[in-house]
From Swiss-Prot:
Keywords: Developmental protein, Differentiation, Disulfide bond, Glycoprotein, Immunoglobulin domain, Neurogenesis, Secreted, Signal
GO molecular function: chemorepellent activity; neuropilin binding; semaphorin receptor binding
PANTHER family from the UniProt entry: SEMAPHORIN, SEMAPHORIN-3A
Cross-referenced Gene3D superfamilies: Immunoglobulins (2.60.40.10), ligand-binding face of the semaphorins, domain 2 (3.30.1680.10), YVTN repeat-like/Quinoprotein amine dehydrogenase (2.130.10.10)
Protein name (record): Semaphorin-3A
Natural source organism: Rattus norvegicus (Rat)
Disulphide-bridged cysteine pairs: C103-C114, C132-C141, C269-C381, C293-C341, C517-C535, C650-C723
Taxonomy, superkingdom: Eukaryota
Amino acid sequence: MGWFTGIACLFWGILLTARANYANGKNNVPRLKLSYKEMLESNNVITFNGLANSSSYHTFLLDEERSRLYVGAKDHIFSFNLVNIKDFQKIVWPVSYTRRDECKWAGKDILKECANFIKVLKAYNQTHLYACGTGAFHPICTYIEVGHHPEDNIFKLQDSHFENGRGKSPYDPKLLTASLLIDGELYSGTAADFMGRDFAIFRTLGHHHPIRTEQHDSRWLNDPRFISAHLIPESDNPEDDKVYFFFRENAIDGEHSGKATHARIGQICKNDFGGHRSLVNKWTTFLKARLICSVPGPNGIDTHFDELQDVFLMNSKDPKNPIVYGVFTTSSNIFKGSAVCMYSMSDVRRVFLGPYAHRDGPNYQWVPYQGRVPYPRPGTCPSKTFGGFDSTKDLPDDVITFARSHPAMYNPVFPINNRPIMIKTDVNYQFTQIVVDRVDAEDGQYDVMFIGTDVGTVLKVVSVPKETWHDLEEVLLEEMTVFREPTTISAMELSTKQQQLYIGSTAGVAQLPLHRCDIYGKACAECCLARDPYCAWDGSSCSRYFPTAKRRTRRQDIRNGDPLTHCSDLQHHDNHHGHSLEERIIYGVENSSTFLECSPKSQRALVYWQFQRRNEDRKEEIRVGDHIIRTEQGLLLRSLQKKDSGNYLCHAVEHGFMQTLLKVTLEVIDTEHLEELLHKDDDGDGSKTKEMSSSMTPSQKVWYRDFMQLINHPNLNTMDEFCEQVWKRDRKQRRQRPGHSQGSSNKWKHMQESKKGRNRRTHEFERAPRSV
């Protein structure tokens, strides 16, 4: 019983060690990594690979009511069916030849720049969309009719009504645009000139005069790149509604030593109509603050992620306080990394109610403004809630003057918990896009993030509380390749109604489901280990979780992913209906090497090998060394000996749960026996060898001998020696053939000459037989 107790203690120690390593380590590693081929074979991705004369599928508009996804691209606007994007309609909207020639004469690229790249695509009313494009460096806008009802099947361009797109769409297709259409008015952050230097936040359309940010003042905007725009209520009074712009820009002089990029959030009041004597047709309520996304470091030196790439607003029960998710990357070309930070709107409002940034001159540092702040406070919307002013045109002159010279806040906005919820620095990609879905699970609600990258992959990540719901950690569930070739993901939309994710890039559009519960496995433990809020064990399979289902049939543990607690009573079911044990038989040659391949589906699983000798029940752990080398794909056994024959068991250990994946039976053949088998047919000994030799063709014999020598011959030290032997044998055989070939050739030549006289009149071509 002593050896049995030792094995039991060893087994339990391995489980505890694996569980500790799992808890301390691999949540930042995708548990499942699915290639594009695997996604296609499992019917988990549908791709639209674009048109030959189009590209840049970057502008998305999701319409859940009509079940359509509108996509703006180069010279085209598409209407995709949300159920299957293979079903689509298209509108062709190119520029005229005159515009294209003018663009070419201006020195622009005729293929990459001199076209109509759609940059704005918004719902205008119940029957029309509003679209704007670059128009070959001549921005243009128009309306698109989509009908009253989905069954109308209308998708038509209003080509009789075109508008100037200046201040709505950029001239340059490489520039980003953020836009929002509310109550017939278009808010847009874009460049308003051909050279791409006059950046501004505009409000156009509607019945009011167009309005914009102050021009040529770096304190307001300093070479910005706009990301997104959102309407967020400030109170229950609609007059207090504000539009928030997210962008990145160059740091203001004196704000940072050297050149740097800062992420910003800017605000404007929806009912801002400009000043009366100063800031006429300019925003009077514009304020901006820096968004911080950094990792605290030693000695107070933080690692900053300043390049804002994308923003997603997760609505809550209180429409005034959505959660802001931001995707950031580093500015450095040496250190490349990505991060996701969360912000609360209460923190944003607290910063906008804080001190203004102020400095007395160009050579002074920025400090908090200590003087008297005029009333009403600059940045406050004119309404009955916060003051007695009905319009920004009624604001006192000192308020307008102060607002013009103090557009920036001194304090930055820090993320929730003062640090990112996810960081990636050790990979060959960077984050580009994000959408978030709030999912009801057995033990609460979880936010599932879908993050796009610049190599065409999508990461599925869930935020899980460690000890409290305020202390979150990210668990990377899946990494999916959604395009055939690596490409930057530039647009993403999530349909909660269809439970589908839609992805845009330069190459095309992809569609994939939010959940793939069946790929996790056919056992309760495998479903539980996945920690996917969308999935639960229903008693017979890993399937979609629905909160209304009967509680007793659901097994799910997102917070801990502990199968030992939730699936222990179903272990018998798992063994019979779950993962089936794969068995293999491998033959190896004494003194040669062989490889035992075993790769678990989960990248977080710890692989554990056991060895069982012939005719023995006892199993022992395999120790690595010079004789046995462990790799990520399996075990490499060098210099095989007869004692290595036996059963090799490959186990996967994850979160304390052990699963046997593979049983390999290794048979080691001694060298003398192999040489006897290889050369018996040449010597003519042995009746069995003769029978096998008679049933094999000469080419099969040579191939078998070459193959066995290549993989198992103990006397061949290098591949060169083997190739040299094969080359010598082939050369010897070729030397023996010329006599026979020459005879056949002469015979055919004689036949040709005998036929020449008969064929001279017709000059027909005589084709040689295949054997020559």
